[in-house]
């Protein structure tokens, strides 16, 4: 909701609000926050920001240059529904106090730069993003890693693996089968009321909502639908989405993960991302080409497909991401596009004759991504496709999963690991850095952070399944 700083300050006064909670996102994509007494906020705070120590924020400044400023966005002001005392919450971007410039490693700033870059090209003045983030709702999660042990244990009342266990009141047996959890009614769907509360809570926070439903996997996989929005707003909405879902779940004694593949041998959780460009209030992806798409829209797809291996370093940025991107679990592993074909990595959804509904859906991403970085990177790839008129090739209007190995060999595939995606980004990042949206320093630090904190530590540790394979060697 559009608000001025003066309106926010008046709201604080009128409602006698004493606590102001300022949220911002770190580089990997986790919200951080600090709460202030109300008198610490004035009109100057909305331009100059409020100082804080950024030395402990992942991927940011070293301790000797750590002073940063949180600049709250008044348009994001809401009352936090999970605080005992009335608390006004705002989402912030980050400034460098020494220079007064926006911080080039702040993901929200990078997202805003992507929109500025789009407008500067003259191609379009607005880009809409619509993420569809899936998640698992568990009743119990335990995990640990020491020098001589490694384990995890995830459990759900809906888990098919629990059909034979003793339960309080008796095991009633309503547990969806593997890959059979899509759209069941109660009592098989145990999360109806929880999802409804999640959805209505988001509506109260001005997130545009659509629907909710059970997803395909057993063990409590769910999805809530929120409407598309402008790039930065959509990323803000996704962070609110995750915040609300986790906190409502906790209220019910449950826990949520957006990990792409927490359960073996069942569907993983993705985050399909719908995208469209507009100019002067008119949609630019509607036309007379394939699937009612415009030539510009096809070039945008060409940019996504060309840069997809590098893009996945931002859209699928964890080692767990690549356990989802495997054949057989409705995950798009082949880089192709199609109308209505959900086995392609880029889909043009069937939208009837409504030009305003023309959009593409990139199906590779997952919700471990930082949405500000992922959306900005996808937009840069699409713009590169338009500027360089990148041909996406012929559409693939067959089920990719039914093709022979010889036919599949002709179709490019997604990277098989986070390390491979980072290697692709190292070789192909001009479409990001050449725009001024991503700085070379940021791309370099992202690769370094992911290798040092995720790829290499995973490589060093024995995996429990290795003991099943090799212990008696």
From Swiss-Prot:
Traits of the deletion mutant: Cells lacking this gene are able to grow with nitrate as the sole nitrogen source, but are unable to grow in ammonium-containing medium. This mutant is impaired in the regulation of the nitrate assimilation system.
Binding site for L-glutamate: 267-268, 324, 330, 342, 363
PROSITE patterns (alphabetical): GLNA_1 (PS00180), GLNA_ATP (PS00181), GS_BETA_GRASP (PS51986), GS_CATALYTIC (PS51987)
Residues given in the record as Mg(2+) 1 binding sites: 272
Subcellular location: Cytoplasm
Record-level GO BP terms: ammonia assimilation cycle; glutamine biosynthetic process; nitrogen utilization
Superkingdom of this protein's organism: Bacteria
Cofactor: Mg(2+)
Pfam family, one: Gln-synt_C
Major location category of this protein: cytoplasm
Residues that, per the record, bind Mg(2+) 2: 134, 215, 223
Cofactor notes: Binds 2 Mg(2+) ions per subunit. Also able to bind Co(2+), Mn(2+) and Ca(2+) ion.
Residues that coordinate or bind ATP: 210, 274-276, 342, 347, 356
Protein purpose: Involved in nitrogen metabolism via ammonium assimilation. Catalyzes the ATP-dependent biosynthesis of glutamine from glutamate and ammonia.
NCBIfam families membership: GlnA
Protein name per the record: Glutamine synthetase
Organism of origin: Synechocystis sp. (strain ATCC 27184 / PCC 6803 / Kazusa)
Lineage: Bacteria, Bacillati, Cyanobacteriota, Cyanophyceae, Synechococcales
Gene from which the chain derives: glnA
């Amino acid at each position: 909701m559009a608000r001025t700083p003066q309106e926010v300050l008046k709201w604080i006064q009128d409602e006698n609000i004493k606590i102001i909670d300022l949220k911002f996102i770190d580089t990997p994509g986790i919200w951080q926050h600090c709460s202030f007494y109300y008198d610490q906020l004035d009109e100057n705070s909305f331009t100059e920001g409020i100082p804080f120590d950024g030395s402990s924020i992942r991927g940011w400044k070293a301790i000797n240059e750590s002073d940063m400023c949180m600049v709250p966005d008044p348009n994001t002001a809401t009352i936090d529904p999970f605080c005992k005392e009335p608390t006004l919450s705002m989402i912030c971007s980050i400034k460098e106090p020494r220079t007064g410039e926006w911080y080039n490693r702040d993901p929200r700033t990078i997202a805003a730069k992507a929109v500025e870059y789009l407008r500067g090209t003259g191609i379009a003045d607005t880009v809409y993003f619509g993420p569809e983030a899936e998640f698992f709702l568990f009743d119990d999660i335990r995990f640990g890693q020491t020098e001589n042990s490694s384990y995890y244990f995830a459990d759900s009342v809906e888990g098919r693996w629990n059909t034979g266990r003793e339960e309080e009141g008796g095991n009633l047996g309503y547990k969806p089968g593997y890959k059979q959890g899509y759209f069941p009614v109660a009592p098989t769907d145990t999360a109806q009321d929880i999802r409804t509360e999640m959805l209505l809570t988001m509506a109260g926070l001005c997130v545009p909502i659509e629907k909710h439903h059970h997803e395909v996997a057993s063990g409590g996989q769910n999805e809530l639908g929120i409407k598309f929005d402008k790039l930065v707003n959509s990323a803000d909405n996704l962070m609110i989405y995750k915040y609300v879902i986790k906190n409502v779940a906790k209220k019910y004694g449950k826990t949520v993960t957006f990990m792409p593949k927490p359960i073996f041998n069942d569907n993983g959780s993705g985050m399909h991302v719908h995208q469209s460009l507009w100019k002067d209030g008119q949609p630019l992806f509607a036309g007379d080409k394939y699937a009612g798409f415009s030539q510009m829209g096809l070039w945008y797809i060409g940019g996504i497909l060309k840069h997809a291996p590098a893009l996945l370093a931002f859209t699928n940025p964890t080692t767990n991401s690549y356990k989802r991107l495997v054949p057989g679990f409705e995950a798009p592993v082949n880089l192709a596009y199609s109308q209505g074909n959900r086995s392609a990595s880029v889909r043009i959804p069937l939208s009837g004759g409504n030009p305003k509904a023309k959009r593409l859906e990139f199906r590779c991403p997952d919700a471990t991504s930082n949405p500000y970085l992922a959306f900005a990177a996808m937009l840069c790839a699409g713009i590169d496709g338009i500027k360089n008129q990148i041909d996406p090739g012929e559409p693939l209007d067959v089920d990719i999963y039914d093709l022979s190995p010889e036919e599949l060999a002709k179709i490019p595939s997604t990277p098989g690991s986070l390390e491979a995606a980072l290697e692709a980004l190292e070789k192909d990042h001009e479409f990001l850095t050449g725009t001024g949206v991503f700085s070379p320093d940021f791309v370099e630090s992202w690769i370094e952070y992911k290798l040092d904190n995720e790829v290499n530590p995973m490589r060093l540790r024995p995996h429990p399944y290795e003991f099943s394979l090799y212990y008696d060697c």
